[in-house]
From Swiss-Prot:
Key words, A-Z: Activator, Bromodomain, Chromatin regulator, Coiled coil, Developmental protein, Nucleus, Transcription, Transcription regulation
SUPFAM superfamilies associated with the record: Bromodomain
Protein name: Transcription factor GTE6
Listed GO biological process terms: chromatin organization; regulation of DNA-templated transcription
Compositionally biased region (Basic and acidic residues): 329-348
CC per GO annotation: nucleus
PANTHER family: OSJNBA0053K19.4 PROTEIN
Organism from which the protein derives: Arabidopsis thaliana (Mouse-ear cress)
Keyword match Coiled coil: yes
Entries under InterPro entries matching the protein: Bromodomain (IPR001487), Bromodomain-like_sf (IPR036427), GTE1 (IPR017413), NET_dom (IPR027353), NET_sf (IPR038336)
């Protein structure tokens, strides 16, 4: 983030730049483009705080600023990887425990029809895939449970779902009066009974995972905020640097300009009387920038034109001109809007008057008849 101001000559300030007007203009354009990029970065920071409902860094930011809860991005990633590894190990333990239920069900005397995939062609079940969307059997489940290549089950609930699918497929395809239907129903009941005793362990793991995910989200937020706090601090420094550069450039320009005349000073003073309260506050800010001892918030404030330096006078001259021009433009727009509104109102009144006249004429004609 510690980019230097574009075109800045380290240790040389503006000495490496020609005093030629075109060179100064080009330099100003470079700095202004750089300021635009800073504003874009600042907007990203503001959007971040807006998205988490915090303005100017809330309690999280305060703790982060104190250094007590700063968590680096790399550390967050390492902690997340460690947490995932521990969670995966816990889930593997659960799936191993579930293996006991699986063996008990598959060793039951009614399990044999479901041990292997249905031989659709051999049994002539031509409509099987029209009824069954996802075939499932115990051998497929066993292979998935024992897979070592990363393609196996990641969660015990996946095994539970496939176990149910075995029985549901059999009950959906076969008639209720068939032996296969009866065996599937009997095994499903036994399986659900055993699962009911096992389920609390799964629910406890879900609670642990939920808490871990909340903590991970909080740590990620802390890391991101720490990054944005650092960015904000650097942006502040760079913006000050940019202001200094622009101030130097302005002084270079002023050095090439003529001095403000006494008449111009008087006109500036008179123009100040026409400014709005907001613009007057900006004027006081301009004076305060050039004169640190000036107190813009004092009860009584006076501006002595004769003691102001040339750069400040030129800034005031241009500011006052722009402020008055904008005020005049705004006034003209309001007058135009008022005239348009007045014209519309007059048309409406005229329209109503004409309607009233026509109505009166109709009544007169009727009375004559």
């Amino acid at each position: 983030m510690a980019d230097s101001v574009p075109g800045h000559v380290a240790g040389g300030g503006l000495q490496g730049f020609s005093v030629d007007a075109e060179c100064i203009k080009q330099r100003v354009d470079e700095v202004l483009q750089w300021v635009d990029s800073l504003e874009h970065k600042l907007k990203e920071v503001e959007e971040f705080y807006s998205s988490i409902g915090v303005s100017n860094s809330g309690s999280i930011g305060k703790d982060t600023e104190k250094g007590r809860h700063v968590v680096g991005i790399r550390k967050i990633q390492q902690e997340a990887a460690r947490r995932e590894a521990v969670a995966a190990k816990r889930m593997q333990d659960l799936m191993r425990q579930f293996g006991t239920i699986f063996r008990q069900i598959t060793q039951h005397k009614c399990a044999w029809p479901f041990m292997h995939p249905v031989n659709v062609e051999g049994l002539g079940l031509h409509d099987y895939f029209e009824v069954i969307d996802k075939p499932m059997d115990f051998s497929t489940i066993k292979n998935q449970m024992e897979a070592k290549d990363g393609t196996g089950y990641k969660h015990v609930m996946q095994i539970y779902a496939d176990m149910r699918l075995v029985f549901e497929n059999a009950m959906n395809y076969n008639e209720e009066t068939s032996d296969v239907y009866s065996m599937a129903k009997k095994l499903l009941e036994k399986f659900e009974e055993k699962w009911a005793h096992f389920l609390p362990k799964v629910q406890e793991e879900e609670k642990i995972r939920e808490e871990e995910e909340k903590q991970a989200a909080k740590e990620a937020l802390l890391a991101k905020e720490a990054s944005h706090i650092k960015t904000t601090r650097e942006l502040g420094n760079e913006i000050c640097h940019a202001n200094d550069e622009l101030e130097k450039l302005m002084r270079k320009v002023v050095e090439r300009c003529r001095k403000i005349t006494i008449e111009e000073k008087r006109n500036i003073g008179l123009a100040l009387l026409k400014l709005s309260p907001d613009d007057l506050q900006k004027v006081l800010g301009i004076v305060a920038q050039a004169n640190p001892s000036f107190q813009p918030r004092a009860e009584e404030v006076s501006i002595e034109m004769d003691i102001l330096d040339e750069p400040t006078l030129w800034r005031l001259k241009f500011f006052v001109k722009d402020a008055l021009d904008n005020a005049m433009k705004k006034k003209k727009e309001e007058e135009t809007k008022t005239r348009e509104l007045s014209g519309a109102q007059k048309k409406e009144v005229s329209k109503k008057r004409n309607a009233t006249t026509k109505l009166a004429e109709r009544k007169t004609k009727r009375s004559r008849i």
